[in-house]
Swiss-Prot record:
One of its GO terms (cellular component) is cytosol. It catalyses: shikimate + NADP(+) = 3-dehydroshikimate + NADPH + H(+). SUPFAM superfamilies: Aminoacid dehydrogenase-like, N-terminal domain, NAD(P)-binding Rossmann-fold domains. Homodimer. It comes from Cereibacter sphaeroides (strain KD131 / KCTC 12085) (Rhodobacter sphaeroides). It comes from the Bacteria. Pathway: Metabolic intermediate biosynthesis; chorismate biosynthesis; chorismate from D-erythrose 4-phosphate and phosphoenolpyruvate: step 4/7. GO terms for molecular function: NADP binding; shikimate 3-dehydrogenase (NADP+) activity. This is Shikimate dehydrogenase (NADP(+)). Pfam families: SDH_C, Shikimate_DH, Shikimate_dh_N. The active site is at K71. Keywords: Amino-acid biosynthesis, Aromatic amino acid biosynthesis, NADP, Oxidoreductase.
Length: 279
């Protein structure tokens, strides 16, 4: 097969990978835009990660998405790491360059911001504090994005105080750490509220942070998208808040990689959303 006739391959690697909506999303975009290409989900064990990444370009892959548990590990295997991926400490998008180098990026933060801009167009993040629950990889991406858009203060609460303190050390004085027992007490006057934990996800413990102090002018978003309408979003909506579910972040974070791999910037719209939800 010559270079001219090679059909580009992309995919997603993780363990397990069966839950991923990425194949449905990228498959939909390929069909929508009439593009030649394939997007393949692959279960990859940690012990095989280095060998798999080395083999993928030879098999015709132009890049891949990365999900749990490999998002941190691929940083050390990439030749080029973007500043934002280095700051977050994880990558979700790899590009296999023609010169043989692996380029690692993290688009979670831009996906988060784009989701709120699209679904809460009146959102003004610079107008007041943000509350972030959780201190894992998703929280790091969200905090980096919030700082970039000018949030003046980030109130962070996590079930493990040590992880939150470590995150503050990396991101600086805008981040104020609070004990988890205070998670509901830091909501007053916050204009952005984000759950980055797995609380409320199908099969996980319920989200039980009291929301009495919630600012009705806040935009509240939950990165959990299974279920789509989490307890947090239902209660926040009842309190008068604008709510944004987590599916849009998944859709928006995928667009930059698709463009790099297949040459078309895909639209994230209601048709895209419906196609993914139908799978």
């Amino acid at each position: 097969m010559t270079e001219l006739t090679r059909i580009p391959l992309a995919g997603v690697i993780g363990l397990p990978i069966a839950h991923s909506r990425s194949p449905a999303l990228h498959g939909y975009w390929l069909k929508r835009y009439g593009l030649k290409g394939h997007y393949i989900p692959m279960d990859v064990a940690q012990a095989d990660l280095r060998d798999v990444l080395a083999a993928m370009p030879r098999m015709g892959f132009v890049g891949c998405n990365v999900t749990i548990p490999h998002k941190e590990s691929v940083i050390g295997l990439a030749d080029i790491v973007t500043d934002r991926a280095a700051l977050i400490g994880a990558a979700n998008t790899l590009i296999f360059r023609k010169d043989g180098k692996i380029h690692a990026d993290n688009t979670d933060g831009t996906g988060f911001t784009a989701n709120l801009r699209q679904n809460a167009p009146a959102w003004q993040p610079q107008s007041g504090p943000a509350v972030v629950w959780g201190a894992g990889g998703a929280a790091r991406a969200v905090i980096a994005a919030l700082i970039e858009v000018g949030v003046p203060e980030i109130r962070l609460a996590n079930r493990s105080r040590a992880r939150a303190d470590a995150l503050r050390s990396d991101f600086g004085a805008k981040v104020h750490v609070h004990d988890w027992v205070q998670a509901g007490n830091i909501l007053e006057d916050a204009v952005t509220v984000v759950n980055t934990t797995s609380l409320g996800m199908v099969g996980k413990p319920e989200f039980r942070v009291p929301l009495d102090a919630l600012n009705p002018k806040a935009v509240v978003t939950d990165l959990v998208y299974a279920p789509l309408r989490t307890r947090l979003l239902v209660e926040a909506e009842a309190a008068g808040c604008r709510t944004v579910d987590g599916l849009g972040m998944l859709l928006h974070q995928a667009a930059p990689g698709f463009e790099r791999w297949f040459g078309v910037r895909p639209e994230v719209d209601e048709e895209t959303r419906a196609a993914v939800l139908a799978t």
